[in-house]
Regions:
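Terminal "cap-and-tail" regions of soluble proteins that handle hydrophobic small molecules
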Residues: 80-138
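Short, surface-exposed beta-strand-loop junctions and turns on beta-sheet-rich folds
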Residues: 18, 59-61, 92
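Short, solvent-exposed coil/turn segments at beta-strand boundaries
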Residues: 1, 48-50, 76-83
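Short, surface-exposed coil-to-beta transition loops
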Residues: 37-39, 54, 67-74
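A solvent-exposed, acidic/Ser-Thr-rich amphipathic alpha-helical stretch
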Residues: 2-51
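Generic short beta-strand segments
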Residues: 8, 54-60
Length: 138
């Protein structure tokens, strides 16, 4: 997946805001840690250097082992045949309800838990990058 991105690419979703090699690292980490992962995509549209797609990822969240079905809308901008800008949209509260269970149901809508999740995800990605020199910035 990482090879689809331009070296100067930017990625944003409700959890991450990344650039360059860190996008590669995120996909590597998520796919490596995902249990029972499957992906279905639909409504792919391409016009010039812009594309969009809807997709649904199904997996067991590695921290809680709870099943997650996450519908995502993606938009892409391409440069030199590679993704230079990628934006994913999904309902973070719905994701937290599935992935975290009761705590996600009760607190997933709060800025407190959303920010805690973002911090946890950033720390996990930083640890992954530290263990994989190929993703460290030059």
């Amino acid at each position: 997946m990482g090879n689809c991105y331009h070296p100067d690419a930017k990625f944003k979703d409700p959890v991450y805001e990344l650039e360059g090699k860190h996008i590669h690292a995120m996909w590597h980490m998520l796919l490596e840690r995902g249990k029972e992962f499957s992906l279905v995509y639909s409504e792919v549209e391409v016009f010039d250097n812009v594309a969009s797609a809807n997709w649904e990822a199904s997996y067991k969240f590695n921290v809680t082992n709870l099943p997650v079905v996450n519908p995502v809308s993606s938009s892409f901008i391409f440069e030199d045949g590679l993704i230079i800008n990628h934006h994913d949209s999904f309902d973070l509260y719905e994701w937290q309800k599935q992935a975290l269970g009761f705590p996600g149901i009760m607190l997933g809508w709060t800025p407190f838990l959303k920010n805690k999740l973002r911090k946890y995800a950033a720390n996990a990605l930083n640890a992954f990058i530290a263990a994989h020199p190929e993703y460290q910035n030059d």
